[in-house]
Amino acid sequence: MTDTAAQRHHRLQAHADLLTQTLRGIEKEGLRVDHQGVLARTAHPAGLGAALTNAHVTTDYSEALLELITGTHTDVDSLLGELRDTHRYVYGVLEGEYIWNQSMPATLPPEADIPIAWYGTSNTGMLKHVYRRGLAERYGKTMQCIAGVHYNFSLPDALWDVLVPDAPTPQARRSRGYISLIRNFTRYSWLLMYLFGSAPALAREFMRGRDHLLETLDPSTLYLPYATSLRMSDLGYQNKAQSRLKLCYNDLDTFLGRLYEAVTEPWPAYQAIGTRRDGQWIQLNTNVLQIENEYYSSIRPKRATGRCERPITALAERGVQYVEVRCLDIDPLTPEGISAETARFVDAFLLFCATSDSPFFPDNGYCQRSADNFAVVVKEGRKPGLMLDREGQAVSVPQWGHELLDQIAPYAALYDQALGGDAYAAALAAQRAKLDQPDLTPSARVLAALREGNVSFHDYSLDLSRRHADALRAQPLPAERTQAYAEAARQSVAEQLRLEQSDAVDFDTYVAHYHAALKNPLPSTAS
């Protein structure tokens, strides 16, 4: 008998208390800039500890690209409270610098002078550094300075037992459920870009003289008039190796099999570069992907890994643990880069994706229609009369958006039922207004501020970042919280030193071991 979305919602309603065990966490990126809004060329601040081993503050691509990481939380208020505290601690350490509160970068130095993140001399640290050298060779450093907010989300196993009762084991129920969620996310994530995309403009110099289709807003600012998120668009940058990847979200095994092919298949252009230059490692290998994380996507199935364990192997052996939503822009109007309203809507949206009917994708498991809808919304989502493709039928953004909000509303209500209050319903109601009035979207508000203030993207962003810094510094952390962050920083330095002193093999051998740790997730297909 077919299990319908209505039946799953009914079962979910009877077990709504399990929603109190939803876990969510945030990784928020932000460039360090100097007082003029220029990318900081300083080393990672000592007061923030070792980027390799500090669980609260690390770096992403560049030495200047901070990444602030929360733990997992069972409610949004405590989640954002921790993120706010981490920002406050960081601002207590930074001297003469700000966190750039925009997804599109600040003023960047010449490409060659953008500093790649450094993690010390341990094999673990060097692996991370060389991987980033490879990204520079493949995509350029400028693109790697784009920042975002990653939202990690998991439902308790007991809830997957309710939603996916026909799978044979808890691991199978969980993995099947998350992959089903990802298919629906792929179908409907255009809505997140319309509602929360905050990157319609950028600094002209970001394009580095490349050809583009952007328009001029002022001498130093480029934009698209109806764009929601240039960060999630191609921006005129095409990567042939990744553009041919069509990963399948119909089942975990096929997804992992195709990802395995990408991290083991040589790519001629990368073979021409090689892995060393002047005796120095410049990329980990010459394959389509150096490692799994190089694959760019708006959502990922995730599983915590052990040291030297490969993500493919962890997912194949222990299944999906949570999903990582990667398409959220930094909210420039919020000091922490994401609001409670946004987080609550994303919760309800993801629960809707997990529970709704999620048919398999045709065409070998890749949905070109969904990719096209996403691409058009990030470039012209607010364009009057814009039509999207829903199963072969043209539908307007407001019509489809309102219909989706109608479908998401019962899941927002379930979170309110479980947690008390009406905060989830209020978050959903705020999104309806954006569909009716595109001028209320973050992307429209950013462009309005630039036009009305007759100000460049750079000056507007620097002013906002300064004001957020002032607001955060005006609320210093309690002494015991400051002490806890400082102690974590000290311990991270000691842990990095321990790793450097405990390496038993040279780096070449370590890289070989790391590649050898990758297991074919579909051994029956191995030749």
From Swiss-Prot:
UniProt cross-references to Pfam families, sorted A to Z: Glu_cys_ligase
Catalysed reaction equations from the record: L-cysteine + L-glutamate + ATP = gamma-L-glutamyl-L-cysteine + ADP + phosphate + H(+)
GO molecular function, one term: ATP binding
GO cellular component: cytosol
Swiss-Prot/TrEMBL keywords: ATP-binding, Glutathione biosynthesis, Ligase, Nucleotide-binding
Pathway(s) it belongs to: Sulfur metabolism; glutathione biosynthesis; glutathione from L-cysteine and L-glutamate: step 1/2
Name of the molecule in the record: Glutamate--cysteine ligase
Organism for this UniProt entry: Bordetella bronchiseptica (strain ATCC BAA-588 / NCTC 13252 / RB50) (Alcaligenes bronchisepticus)
Gene: gshA
